[in-house]
A protein has these predicted regions:
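Gly/Pro-enriched, hydrophobic low-complexity segments
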Residues: 122-128, 135-190
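Short beta-strands and strand-coil junctions in structured, solvent-facing domains, enriched
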Residues: 49-50, 77-79, 149-151, 167
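Short hydrophobic/aromatic-rich beta-strand segments that constitute the beta-sheet cores
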Residues: 42, 69-73, 88-90, 142-144, ...
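Flexible, processing/modification-adjacent segments and terminal tails
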Residues: 20-48, 52-54, 92-147, 154
């Protein structure tokens, strides 16, 4: 009898442990979904095999739920990239170029990795990636690995780190070893 009770306890503990990360991911996604607007500053470093030093840029990211994301690069040269629904607009100086995201499906995973995470849209992430979540709501890491074999030729994985409803780092690794690392910081006075 004691063995049966012990077996049930071990089984329940194993189920709880297995459900834990999923529950924490659901909590994080729920927290993220509650945030309707956010502004952070960013520093992005691109580590390219052709260069001895990383290429660094900085600026700010602005998010308006559920599907508007704006990246304003200040240095090394001013550039604004706006994703609004299915439209992507890039502006450099007086020149502006707009394209339909549907016409460039290879861009969708990059956009959705951040936009769907900020929106707390787990289903959108799961359509494109295999999700691995570690941590708790207080401090978490979400690894995204492409489900599509063609995409996997371009992106090895995307790692997003955060705390509660805030992202702190986004790292995109390519199969050839090149990678970009974006560090995010809340604006002061927030």
């Amino acid at each position: 009898m004691k063995l049966a009770v012990l077996g049930v306890c071990v089984s329940l503990w194993a189920c709880a442990a297995a459900a834990g990360p999923g529950d924490a991911l659901d909590e994080v996604m729920h927290s993220l979904a509650q945030r309707r607007h956010g502004e952070v500053s960013f520093v992005e470093q691109q580590f390219l095999s052709l260069l001895k030093r990383p290429v660094e840029s900085y600026g700010e990211l602005i998010y308006d739920a559920p599907n508007r994301l704006e990246k304003r690069t200040i240095e090394p040269r001013a550039e604004t990239l706006v994703v609004d629904g299915e439209t992507v607009t890039v502006q450099r100086g007086r020149r502006s170029h707009t394209l339909d995201l549907k016409a460039y499906p290879q861009l969708l995973p990059f956009v959705e990795s951040i936009r769907a995470t900020l929106a707390g849209d787990r289903a959108a992430l799961e359509r494109l990636f295999r999700l691995e979540f570690t941590g708790s709501e207080v401090r978490w890491t979400l690894d995204l690995r492409p489900l599509d074999a063609e995409l996997a030729k371009t992106v090895a994985d995307i790692r997003i780190e955060g705390s509660r409803d805030e992202l702190s780092r986004v790292e995109i690794r390519q199969p050839d070893g090149d990678r970009s690392l974006m560090t995010l910081r809340a604006h002061s006075g927030r």
